[in-house]
Amino acid sequence: MRFYKDHYDVVIIGGALAGMAAALQLQAKGVRDILILEKHNMPGGVATDYIRDGFEMEASLHEMMSIGPKGKRLKVGQFFDDMGIDIDWLPVPEPYRVVVPGEGIDTVLHDGYEHMARDIDAACPGTYDKVLEFIRLCRRVYDSMDVISVTPMSKLRMLREHPDFVRVAGYSASEVIRTFDLPQKAVDMLTPYWIYVGEPMDNLPF
């Protein structure tokens, strides 16, 4: 008996998160003949683990964003709900704790724009408004990227409808954050999640 069939409605190259998510969406729309090709002996891509000496080690991804509580789902959480996948999510009540020995920084930053701005303001008084505006700028640029990535548009329309995106395009994260004239202590509290992706702020595009 042959393992592969002569015909598939869809062939997906790569069994990582994007490939499996695409297969899920296709199945939800009624496509059943799907083949996922993956060169590794395990699917999942960077979302993988291994077992050594009886201990299971997470090799990479260990946290997911954009889930949200039931009834107030965010993008990723809504995707799993729409696909009929019931996951018992373990919520993380705060994004991170930042500790800088010798600099007097040991602060837990909580979820929510205003809450995070208050956390930083408590350690750096007088920074609340600037921090909040910086976070909101990040949100506006993120939302613009969501639209621009799937919507063809002229440069004029982009300038008119997404001015913040155009304004910061081409600048590094450190260049943009410096325009807010925040004390270094506040910058040190804001930026740990950014360098989490593996690039220093000077090299990381905003």
Regions found by a protein language model. Name each.
Residues G102-P205:
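Rossmann-like flavin
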Residues R2-R140:
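N-terminal glycine-rich phosphate/pyrophosphate-binding loop and immediately adjacent elements
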